[in-house]
Curated annotation (Swiss-Prot):
Spans of repeat LRR: 543-567, 568-590, 703-726, 735-758, 759-786, 808-833
The UniProt record lists the keyword Signal: no
Source organism, top-level taxon: Eukaryota
Family the entry assigns: Belongs to the disease resistance NB-LRR family.
Protein name according to UniProt: Probable disease resistance protein At1g59620
Functional summary from the UniProt entry: Probable disease resistance protein.
Keyword vocabulary terms for this entry: ATP-binding, Leucine-rich repeat, Nucleotide-binding, Plant defense, Repeat
Species this protein is from: Arabidopsis thaliana (Mouse-ear cress)
Comment on protein domains: The LRR repeats probably act as specificity determinant of pathogen recognition.
Length: 870
């Protein structure tokens, strides 16, 4: 596993040396020797990669070589970065620093010679050894199981308040629970639904908070102690009909910790999943426990065939006899477990020839004969399949997949951030971008991993892309092999070695401080808010090789330590929700940053010196929502930006935007007077812009010249407007290909529908928070031909809605929320046969009564599968 990863690292380092060879004057001899030695490493790793399973000596050697590669990269980049900083400083400083140049050259010469000696030592002792050749969503039968479980949850006569699914890992417990959770009968029966991934290292407070966000969203922003959470949830679950899914509970005592929020004999139900049947018995000794069976050989073949031949799912299609024979031999090693079948299918779906199948079948047998370090006897064959699937990944995907091991179990990973983590660590090499954005490359990698069933993710309905992902716990065990190889470490890791990456999730600050004494640390991620801590001045001084630094929620109080300017290798820096009031001017040294998030806590007014103009490599920039009045930013130099958030006209010039021609996403906050034609002119230069948000402050204040706003952006698909205006601009002011539009706080006095319905590509429309202040709204025949989702929320003056026959013929989901004066749903809904879901959230009992079965308006919604009242 590490051999391939290292080959990737050596190739990346080789590219760096070739690209920058002209900049090593004064150390040419040592440079050329080092480059020659690296070539030896490449040859060694190619040989080692082929025979990694049979030799402990090879494994140990690879670990030592890995340290050499990392140290080489650190030395080379430090030398190059110092030279670059020298070029960008004034003449006086350059003359003053000239005396340091020769010592720097002597130091790198000595460092290079030391590295060459280390490589030579490896070459002499280990690399000459030879290695012996060794040639060694798709579901079946789920419907009945889902129906059975749904029945136990919704039937009135079933008194079991806890329903359980138990069985070994990979048998499909979570998949089954997810199907039940999303079942239309369940959605219509329960007023609130909550899903919680419990995991081995859960905290009770986290579980309770997650449940509260779903069953009592009005309390989300309230800070509560555990006792307060327990009391609030106990009351809510005593009055509301809710389904809580507790996925992956490990121990009986874990249930005991969570259980106090559930009052006896009320309308709530729990669906839990666990590998441990004892958990189910502890939760409800007399409750219904469902145990999925392993798949039969016939069912296994059906699943496998559907995955590997996705376009040929007909009984008439004939699979090549020899491939079918090989396939049936391979699936025997999956043990009837759906997870293993999906992963094996994901592996073979990208291989099309009989010879490739024979090779993979030989590798499966080789793994089982040769063995790996997995010790679970009951599932050893399954682990071998998963391990082989990893090894069959392309090199670039292996590196990116192993990176996921550092995140906690069941942690939901944000894919935009992950794309930048990968880029900051140089995992996709420069040629992979070839003009594509960092996010697009990351999306492509995730799509590959999803296709191979190595990660779990679902496309977002609005953006049509993967936004988050996570690992199945068994797949994560394969991924965690990386920790043994000293590549990463999580906060709870027991590894005595010094890793290059560290993830911190709350925890003991004393223990964390000990781990931060490692000067070779390259990546530090805080994934929970840490609270007050005063040790960062020392950390920044010590951790000068850092590439990725995510300081989510860290409380600095006042000024960020100036020593952060020493982290000259940083490519990723996030201060999201951190607490700070001043950024130091030393941050101007962070010229290699690709990603910079300065969106600190909203309560903080922060001062930012005018150093952002020097960060020419930036691809992502998120500015604070509140900045000191003295802040003036020049951003016109940031021509590589792909995403700019929270740009304020109070602190920056709109004219700077026209130079950011690579922008895909932009949010603008307009404060004070602004010429709309100037803004439109700048936006017209952004030919690749896909997502635009424009907000005007103060809210509900008239804005002059709004009729001059023309959004002439060729690629614009998503538009969010929070601008006070009595009337929408005419439809020709909007891009014809706009897919989503969201309006809020506009106070439109004229009905916006006659304009919006002429934007023929609209897929989703949201009108919220007083976006419309009129009384009557009409959707006419032929309007909104592509619309699938419509949200009408917080329209306090709206009384009447007319929908003509032929309007919104593809509408799938409708939400009506907090529209207190709306008298009734329109008669025309009965013509929209595509409607699948209607959600009505109103404090109006008569409204619900009329739409319920037997009510006078029931005919309007009787064709809709799911109608929910909250």
């Amino acid at each position: 596993m590490a051999e391939t990863l290292l080959s990737f690292g050596v190739e990346k380092l080789w590219d760096l040396l070739v690209r920058e060879s002209d900049r090593f004057q004064g150390v040419k001899k040592q440079f050329n020797e080092l480059r020659s030695d690296l070539n030896k490493l490449r040859c060694f790793l190619e040989d080692a990669d082929a025979k990694k399973h049979q030799s402990a000596m090879v494994s140990n050697t690879v670990k030592e070589v890995k340290e050499i590669v990392y140290d080489t990269e650190d030395i080379i980049e430090t030398f190059l970065r110092k030279k670059q900083l020298g070029r960008t400083r004034g003449m006086k400083k350059r003359i003053k620093e000239f005396a340091c140049v020769l010592p720097d050259r002597r130091k790198i010469a000595i460092d290079m010679e030391g590295l060459s000696k280390r490589i030579a030592k490896k070459d002499k002792r280990n690399m000459r050894q030879t290695f012996s050749n060794n040639n060694e969503s798709v579901l079946v039968g789920l419907e009945e199981n889902v129906k059975k479980l749904v029945g136990h949850l919704v039937e009135v006569e079933d008194s079991s308040q806890v329903v359980s699914i138990t069985g070994m890992g990979g048998i499909g417990k979570t998949t089954l629970a997810r199907q039940v959770f999303n079942h239309e009968t369940v959605k219509s029966h329960f007023a609130q639904l909550a899903w919680v991934c419990v995991s081995q290292q859960f905290t009770r407070k986290y579980v309770w908070q997650t449940i509260l966000r779903k069953v009592g969203p009005e309390y989300i922003k309230l800070e509560m102690t555990e006792d307060e959470l327990q009391e609030k949830l106990f009351r809510l679950l005593g009055t509301r009909k809710a389904l809580i899914v507790l996925d992956d509970i490990w121990r009986e005592e874990d249930w005991d910790m969570i259980e106090p929020i559930f009052p006896l004999g009320k309308g709530w139900k729990v669906l839990l999943t666990s590998r441990n049947e004892g958990v189910a018995l502890r939760a409800n000794p007399n409750g219904f426990i469902f145990k999925p069976d392993c798949l039969t050989p016939e069912e296994s073949w059906t699943i496998f065939r559907r995955i590997v031949f996705p376009g040929e799912n007909t009984t008439e299609y004939k699979v090549d006899e020899k491939m079918e024979e090989l396939g049936k031999q391979m699936i025997k090693h999956c043990g009837g477990l759906p997870l293993a079948l999906k992963v094996l299918g994901g592996l073979l779906v990208v291989h099309f020839t009989l010879d490739e199948w024979k090779r993979i079948y030989g590798n499966i047998k080789s793994h089982i004969v040769g063995g790996t370090s997995f010790n679970d006897k009951n599932m050893s064959s399954v682990y071998h399949i998963l391990h082989l699937s990893f090894e069959e990944l392309p090199i670039y995907l292996k590196h990116c997949f192993l990176y996921l091991a550092q995140f906690p179990e069941d942690f939901t990973i944000d894919l935009e951030k992950l794309s930048y983590y990968w880029a900051a660590e140089g995992m996709p090499r420069p040629r992979y971008y070839d003009g594509a954005t960092i996010r697009k490359v990351g999306d492509g990698y995730i799509e590959e991993l999803v296709k191979r069933n190595m990660v779990i993710s679902e496309r977002d309905a609005r953006t049509r892309r993967f936004e988050t992902c996570h690992l199945h716990d068994i797949v994560r065990e394969v991924c965690l092999k990386a920790e043994e190889e000293n590549l990463i470490e999580t906060e709870n890791s027991k590894s005595p070695s010094k890793p290059r990456r560290l993830v911190v999730k709350g925890g003991d600050k004393t223990d964390m401080e000990g781990k931060l004494k490692n000067p070779k640390l390259r990546s530090l991620l805080f994934i929970e808010e840490l609270g007050g801590y005063r040790g960062f001045e020392v950390w920044f001084t010590r951790l000068q090789l850092m590439r990725v630094l995510d300081l989510h929620g860290v409380e600095f109080g006042g000024e960020l330590p100036s020593s952060i300017g020493l982290l000259i290798h940083l490519r990723y820096l996030s201060l999201y929700r951190a607490k700070a009031s001043h950024l130091p001017s030393s941050m101007q040294n962070l010229k290699m940053l690709l990603y910079l998030n300065l969106c600190v806590q909203e309560s903080c007014y922060i001062y930012i010196p005018n150093f952002l103009k020097e960060m020419l490599e930036l691809k992502y920039l998120s500015l604070p929502l509140r900045m000191d009045d003295k802040v003036k930013l020049e951003l016109g130099n940031l021509v590589n930006l792909e995403k700019l958030e929270n740009f304020s006209t109070e602190h920056g010039g709109v004219g700077d935007l026209q130079f950011m021609t690579r922008l895909r996403a932009l949010s603008i906050y307009i404060r004070g007077r602004l010429n709309m034609k100037t803004l439109s002119s700048s936006l017209s230069k952004l030919r690749d812009l896909e997502n635009l948000t424009i907000c005007y402050y103060p809210m509900y204040a008239p804005m002059s010249g709004i009729e001059g706003l023309v959004l002439d952006c060729d690629q614009l698909k998503h538009l969010n407007l929070r601008i006070y205006m009595p009337r929408l601009p005419d439809e020709q002011h909007f891009p014809w290909h706009l897919r989503n539009i969201s309006l809020a706080e506009c106070c439109l006095k004229e009905d916006p529908m006659p304009i919006l319905e002429k934007l023929l590509q609209l897929n989703e429309v949201s009108l919220s928070h007083q976006s419309f202040c009129g009384k009557r709204m009409v959707c006419s025949d032929g309007g909104f031909p592509q619309l699938q989702k419509l949200d009408l929320c917080g329209l306090e003056e709206w009384e009447e809605w007319i929908v003509e026959e032929g309007s919104m013929p593809r509408l799938h989901k409708l939400t009506i929320r907090n529209d207190p004066k709306l008298k009734e749903l329109p008669d025309g809904l009965k013509f929209i046969t595509s409607l699948k879901e209607v959600h009505v959230i109103l404090n109006n009992w008569d409204f619900k009564k009329k739409l319920s079965r037997g009510g006078e308006d029931y005919y309007k919604v009787q064709h809709i599968p799911l109608v929910r009242f909250l």
